[in-house]
Amino acid sequence: MQNKLCSLRLGTYALLSFALFSSSVRAQTLKEVAKFDLPGPGGKRFDYLTIDEDDHYLISAHLAAEQTYVIDLRTNKVIATVSDTPGVEGVEYVPELKKFYTSNAHDNTIGVVDLKQMKVIKKLKTDAKPDGSAYAAPFHKLYVSDERGKAEAIIDVRKDEIIKTLHFDSETGMPQYDPVTRKVYVNLQDENIFAVIDPVADDVIGRYPVGKCKGNHGMTLAPEQHRAFLSCEGNDLMTVFDLDKHQAIVFLPMARGPDVIKFDVGLKRIYVACSSGAISVFQMDDPDHYRKLEDFLVQKKVHSLAVDVETHRVYAPEQEEDGKAVARMVVYEVVSR
């Protein structure tokens, strides 16, 4: 009888273990398909990425190495290393001019990079620690958050001149341009406020609280669904903000240390790079309903990622592997949809 009970228990344990394993496999959202070294020194922090969809280039800011890489997504090869970008944080591509702009935190400038020459052709002085940036194409304006300067610098990209600077009582987080409402949004992360800028006159026309979200630093948009997604670094929440009602409607927990957040419009999937060692993944079922799919494990100190909307691949730079210094880009494909 005792042997039968033992066998029964072992069988039950095996079934439970198999079920948990199967569930874990089914729940996985991403798989690593490639990784390649980058030319900068290992162990140095990376920051924002942006994709040039015309040329299939990934532009990667290597903040602590003070340089920026241009990577061909078709070959996963670095085709250029742009220097003179000290402390580069934000990078933003302007397609019609074949230029991209770097937010250089270490000399408080915005660098103008000509993609044909692959070099900095001009620098614009800002207040303090320029960070994230967003391009409002119909207005030919680039909006750059001067995080520690508590400001938003506005650049006319046709002249490459700062035409206005908006000042706030808060550090500024990531801005975004909404092509549906034709408005610019910016996180006021010290005050937990979502600000709205009219790019016609470049006036602030609204300020709205973000509910339980603390430290709304990162932002991405789902323009067709009239939603903004915020990464709240103060309390590790992914917050959904209704752009019509101007209020936060959903709060979901994510891994510690959230930073850059991106939305895959085709899959309706939200990714957040978390420096504790995970990419938190969420699914939009409809504009009012969301599910957390998983905290996909990656190396620690991953702060940034980019999503290729054509291939749905996710790109994330790593500065360490199990504590060992590296400098590389990791490529992930979607497993479950």
Q: Residue ranges of each PLM-predicted region?
A:
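Bacterial N-terminal signal peptides that target proteins for export
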Residues: 2-13
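Bacterial N-terminal signal peptides
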Residues: 11-21
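Predominantly soluble domains enriched in secretory-pathway, periplasmic, or organellar proteins
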Residues: 26-337
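Compositionally biased, low-structure terminal segments
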Residues: 1, 19-22, 291
